[in-house]
């Protein structure tokens, strides 16, 4: 069936900010879909609130709206643009829920907008747990015995009948939000109450736990002609009970017999047909390992995290084809873009093994509960490809960037059998490492299988790795053993440690005897047809399929998995850099390992190597390709950290030199450079011992800011108010020694300013200056940023511009630089300089129209700023106001403190733009998920140091009609100032207290600032967590609170009696 000609304009809904459960995979699928629809000649209108993505680039769609994804704003866009159709299945759960909300509000009918791809009825049938259960019963498809509940009482009834454990799955949520496994009544009450709150329709499915079955996923496609195919099937190494986003996944499935494979394949196709889905769909199934009994777990009637993985694992571009199917094309009419010969109705075949390992944020959140269950906790993932499972797994492990190069963790070596058993039974992020350790210590596969039901096949693979370790250690210097270990995916790093050599020595040994990897192509058809994709993975074998051309090439290093501190912003910069390299006439080669991102789409670069970002894996590619050089500026800290090792191998680093990179990162060299340039900075020193640290802090005076050098996202950074806190930090947070010094700075309570600039060594061009709403001390990634700055005098702005130009030239920067300043007592101080792309590059590029990563790449390749039409100085400011607001994923991470400080905690960002700061802030806050009611109650509990400042805030809340609630101490200071306040009991009171008010939804805002040390810190923690669990906006910074007040004041009308007005005027005359 040819494409539809009765529609012209299509609205695509994006997935909004990156949160746990919904990451960069939707930037990839959304970008693909927009391009795909435009190829077919449709006009595409995109709405998405996330400025950090390629998807929201003006070139991606005909019109791009970066607006909040709420009914109010999307309805406005529909009324203004009048699209013929809406495509919601590429924006994750956000896009689906938005479509349902739009349909229910009547706006689609009013404006005559049709939903494309998957019909509303199919979305509801798949997402509404009750309707889905009914459909499965009609199809005679087995599902675990279950019931639908809307109250806690109903949950208790079900459990009486069926017994524990039960699984709770809230309707219309993603990433398992609010769900979990309940083993007893206490867990049931907690999880069901939370689940009902998180579900937009207050509905949960309770089902008998089938934990322990194999978890299998099928990624299927169907068109309007009822052609349906399986793109890829995947198997979770972790049995049912761990969310698939938190599971280690392999593709294709490894332990299914042909009969089992065909049985589950037929079920998946039957379900997609029954739902009438046109496009991509993901079916999750559970298979009993001891019989042919299976259960249908759930269906995602949309492009998902698994489809991004399946696309990269097979090379078959699901989102691109789903968009074409949505406009009426059929699988037998669409050419597969990979082979460019076969049609899309051929099922892909794989002649390699793919492994996906999630990347969790526990290195940032020491206190988080690391146990894995049905609620997702990972922020991102890595993927790797190998010729055997062992190779594939070991490559994935070293892609995670946790400083781990092998399936072993030193701190697990001390574990006794009982502890290992506990950690294997109750899965956490290190379970596979614990399994390997258990096998090393002689625990049998049978015992481990009994503990966690992990399939013997996978346990055998882990045992193969452990046996090979013994071989390697027993045969030092033996080249045959080395060859065998390399074929199994062992790293030079591991072998060097085992053989007591350096990694470089092993690398040289291999090179001398020609023991180097070859590169194989990912072609969707297991080499059955010739293929046109330049998409490669390494393995040890005979024939190399990556043909080196005679064109000059440049290698760009990507940024690896998405994690807190290094998000999709760096992928954005990477992609733009690749495009600029192509424009400049070079061959662009990219190395990356994140299956979710646009940069790992094979159509972006001239060559894509899906490989770990370690020195060994990158050097193999460089040895083969012999590029002009490598660009490390766009891959975040991942790429920067490889610069020194690459240079030691004689590789040319393009852009800012290694020496100059080091000058910006090394504290003493940086101080010397600033002194020479005459640029002021907060007083600070470097300590290499604990005693030194104490002496420095005493001399500078508290509070001080302490942090390790060379760090991204503010890991292990703290503001310390007294000596015992400093000692606690030095002993627990960092291991200080000469190679890892700790920086100690005077902490200045001032306004923070952030600048991104491009330097070519002669000229320095500044696209924009941003002002942070939160004062210095809150990480820049967690602050609300405003452009253009609203409260900087011209004098200060000139100083900032002057210092930026001075630093660009003085540090010999070639390419991008990001500088953070603090304004303290009307003086500008430099806090830090990052000689690389920063997380504000996409935001500033979009609002100023200056393609920063593109210009910087061309500067790096030798075309100066003047030749590109830019000079030195500050780009003229835009008239509108733009706000970048952070988005957090605290609801997914129980027991993590939500307080903002120098350590970054946000997972994503949104943008709000409008003519005034208040309107832009309103949009930014609403887009980030903060509800802003114009009246209600606000709870105020603040640290003593903030009491005075909180008075003015309380007064303003009172004036716009808010009801104030406070605990005794804070209430007393308010009453003394004649501010009406209601006293509430502290949380340790037996009576109705502060937490009850939060739980019952009787407060709209909670203002709680941190009291350091002592008991109040724990109280504050409980107040903040309770707010998150109950969806109440909890403000831990008085600056953020002021910003929200500005918005509220602009939305509400004040009410003053006439007498008050005349008194005010008289008062002004007296003071004039």
From Swiss-Prot:
Region span, Carboxyphosphate synthetic domain: 1-401
Keyword Nucleotide-binding recorded: yes
Region annotated Allosteric domain, chain positions: 930-1072
InterPro entries listed in its UniProt record: ATP-grasp, ATP_grasp_subdomain_1, CarbamoylP_synth_lsu, CarbamoylP_synth_lsu_oligo, CarbamoylP_synth_lsu_oligo_sf, CbamoylP_synth_lsu-like_ATP-bd, CbamoylP_synth_lsu_CPSase_dom, MGS-like_dom
Residue sites binding Mg(2+) 1 per the record: 284, 298
GO biological process: 'de novo' UMP biosynthetic process; glutamine metabolic process; L-arginine biosynthetic process
Details of cofactor binding: Binds 4 Mg(2+) or Mn(2+) ions per subunit.
Region spans: Oligomerization domain: 402-546
Superkingdom, natural source: Bacteria
GO cellular component: cytoplasm
Residue sites binding Mg(2+) 4 per the record: 832, 834
Positions contributing to Mn(2+) 2 binding: 298, 300
Domain note: The large subunit is composed of 2 ATP-grasp domains that are involved in binding the 2 ATP molecules needed for carbamoyl phosphate synthesis. The N-terminal ATP-grasp domain (referred to as the carboxyphosphate synthetic component) catalyzes the ATP-dependent phosphorylation of hydrogencarbonate to carboxyphosphate and the subsequent nucleophilic attack by ammonia to form a carbamate intermediate.
Quaternary organization: Composed of two chains; the small (or glutamine) chain promotes the hydrolysis of glutamine to ammonia, which is used by the large (or ammonia) chain to synthesize carbamoyl phosphate. Tetramer of heterodimers (alpha,beta)4.
Alphabetized HAMAP family for the sequence: CPSase_L_chain_A, CPSase_L_chain_B
Protein name, entry field: Carbamoyl phosphate synthase large chain
Annotated source species: Bacillus mycoides (strain KBAB4) (Bacillus weihenstephanensis)
């Amino acid at each position: 069936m040819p494409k539809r000609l009765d529609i012209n304009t299509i609205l695509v809904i994006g997935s909004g900010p990156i949160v746990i459960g919904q990451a960069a995979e939707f930037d990839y699928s959304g970008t693909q879909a927009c391009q795909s629809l435009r190829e077919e000649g449709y006009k595409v209108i995109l709405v998405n609130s996330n400025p950090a993505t390629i998807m929201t680039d003006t070139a991606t769609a005909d019109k791009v709206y970066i607006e909040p994804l709420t009914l109010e704003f999307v309805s406005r866009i529909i009324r203004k643009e009048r699209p013929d159709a809406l495509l919601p299945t590429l924006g994750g759960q956000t896009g689906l829920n938005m479509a349902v909300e739009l349909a229910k509000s009547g706006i689609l009918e009013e404006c005559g907008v049709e939903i494309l791809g998957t019909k509303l009825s199919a979305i509801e049938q798949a997402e509404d747990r009750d309707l889905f259960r009914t459909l499965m019963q009609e199809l005679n498809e087995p599902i675990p015995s279950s019931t639908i509940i809307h109250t806690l009482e109903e949950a208790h009834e079900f459990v009486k009948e069926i017994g524990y454990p039960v699984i709770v799955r809230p309707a219309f949520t993603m990433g398992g939000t609010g769900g979990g496994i309940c083993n007893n009544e206490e867990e049931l009450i907690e999880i069901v109450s939370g689940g009902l709150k998180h579900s937009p329709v207050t509905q949960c499915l309770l089902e008998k736990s089938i934990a322990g079955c194999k978890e299998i996923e099928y990624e299927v496609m169907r068109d309007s002609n009822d052609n349906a195919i399986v793109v890829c099937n995947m198997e979770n190494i972790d049995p049912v009970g761990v969310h698939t986003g938190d599971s280690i996944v392999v593709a294709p499935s490894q332990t299914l017999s042909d009969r089992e494979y065909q049985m589950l394949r037929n079920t998946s196709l039957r379900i997609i047909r029954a739902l009438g889905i046109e496009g991509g769909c993901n079916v999750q199934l559970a298979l009993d390992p001891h019989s042919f009994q299976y259960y249908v777990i759930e269906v995602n009637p949309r492009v998902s995290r698994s489809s991004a993985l399946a696309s990269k694992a097979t090379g078959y571009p699901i989102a691109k084809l789903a968009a074409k199917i949505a406009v009426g094309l059929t699988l037998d009419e669409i050419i597969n873009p990979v082979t460019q010969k076969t049609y899309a109705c051929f099922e892909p075949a794989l002649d390699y093994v793919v492994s996906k390992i999630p990347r969790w944020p526990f290195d940032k959140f020491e206190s988080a509960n690391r146990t894995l269950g049905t609620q997702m906790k990972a922020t991102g993932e890595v993927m790797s490809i190998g010729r055997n499972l062992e190779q594939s797994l070991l490559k994935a492990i070293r892609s995670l960037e946790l400083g781990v190069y092998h399936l072993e963790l030193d701190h697990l070596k001390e574990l006794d059998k009982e502890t290992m058993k506990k950690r294997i039974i109750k899965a956490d992020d290190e379970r596979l490492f614990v399994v390997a350790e258990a096998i090393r210590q002689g625990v049998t596969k049978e015992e481990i299988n009994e503990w966690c039901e992990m399939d013997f096949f996978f346990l055998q693979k882990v045992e193969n790795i452990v046996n090979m370790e013994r071989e390697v250690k027993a045969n030092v210097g033996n080249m045959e053993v080395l060859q065998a270990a390399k074929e199994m995916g062992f790293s030079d790093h591991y072998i060097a440690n085992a053989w007591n050599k350096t990694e470089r020595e092993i690398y040289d040994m291999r090179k001398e005897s020609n023991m180097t990897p070859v590169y194989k192509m990912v072609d969707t058809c297991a080499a059955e047809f010739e293929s046109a994709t330049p998409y490669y993975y390494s393995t040890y074998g005979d024939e190399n399929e990556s043909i080196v051309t005679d064109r000059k090439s440049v290698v760009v290093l990507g940024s690896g998995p998405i994690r807190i501190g290094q998000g999709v912003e760096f992928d954005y910069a990477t992609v733009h850099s690749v495009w600029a390299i192509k424009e400049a006439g070079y061959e662009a080669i990219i190395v990356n390992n994140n299956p979710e991102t646009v940069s790992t789409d094979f159509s972006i670069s001239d060559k894509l190597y899906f490989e770990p970002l370690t020195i060994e894996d990158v050097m193999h590619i460089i040895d083969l390709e012999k590029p002009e050089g490598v660009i490390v500026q766009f891959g975040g800290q991942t790429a920067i950290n490889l610069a020194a090792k690459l240079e030691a191998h004689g590789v040319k680093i393009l852009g800012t030199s290694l020496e100059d990179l080091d000058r910006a990162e090394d504290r003493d060299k940086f101080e010397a450079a600033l002194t020479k340039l005459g640029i002021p900075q907060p007083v600070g020193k470097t300590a290499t011992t604990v005693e030194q640290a104490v002496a420095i802090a005493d001399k500078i005076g508290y509070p001080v800011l302490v942090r390790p050098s060379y760090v991204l996202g503010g890991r292990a950074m703290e503001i310390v108010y007294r000596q015992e806190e400093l000692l606690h930090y030095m002993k627990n947070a960092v291991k200080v020694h000469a190679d890892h010094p700790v920086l100690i700075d005077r902490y200045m309570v001032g306004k923070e300013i952030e600048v991104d600039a491009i330097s070519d060594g002669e000229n320095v061009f500044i696209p924009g200056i941003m002002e942070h709403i939160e004062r210095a001390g809150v990480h820049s990634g967690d602050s609300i940023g405003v452009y253009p700055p609203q409260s900087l005098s011209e004098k200060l702005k000139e100083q900032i511009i002057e210092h930026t130009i001075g630093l660009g030239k003085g540090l010999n920067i070639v390419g991008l630089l990001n500088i953070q300043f603090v304004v303290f007592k009307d003086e500008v101080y430099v806090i830090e300089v990052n000689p690389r792309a920063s997380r504000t590059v996409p935001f500033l590029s979009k609002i100023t129209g200056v393609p920063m990563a593109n210009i910087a790449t061309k500067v790096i390749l030798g075309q100066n700023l003047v030749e590109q039409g830019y000079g030195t100085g500050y780009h003229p400011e835009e008239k509108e106001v733009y706000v970048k607001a952070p988005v957090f994923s605290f609801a997914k991470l129980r027991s993590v403190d939500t307080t903002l400080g120098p350590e970054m905690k946000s997972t994503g960002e949104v943008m709000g733009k409008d003519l005034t700061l208040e309107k832009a802030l309103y949009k930014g806050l609403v887009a980030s998920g903060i509800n802003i009611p114009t009246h209600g109650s606000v709870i105020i509990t603040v640290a003593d140091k903030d009491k005075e400042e909180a008075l003015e805030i309380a007064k303003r809340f009172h004036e716009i009609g808010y009801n104030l609630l406070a605990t005794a101490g804070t209430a007393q200071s308010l009453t003394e100032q004649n501010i009406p306040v209601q006293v509430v009991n502290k949380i340790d009171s037996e009576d109705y207290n502060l937490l009850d008010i939060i739980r019952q939804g009787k407060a709209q805002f909670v203002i709680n600032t941190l009291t350091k040390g002592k008991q109040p810190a724990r109280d504050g923690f409980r107040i903040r967590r309770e707010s998150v669990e109950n969806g109440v906006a909890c403000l831990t910074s008085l600056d953020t609170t002021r910003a929200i007040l500005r918005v509220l004041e602009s939305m509400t009308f004040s009410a003053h009696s006439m007498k008050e007005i005349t008194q005010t005027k008289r008062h002004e005359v007296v003071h004039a």
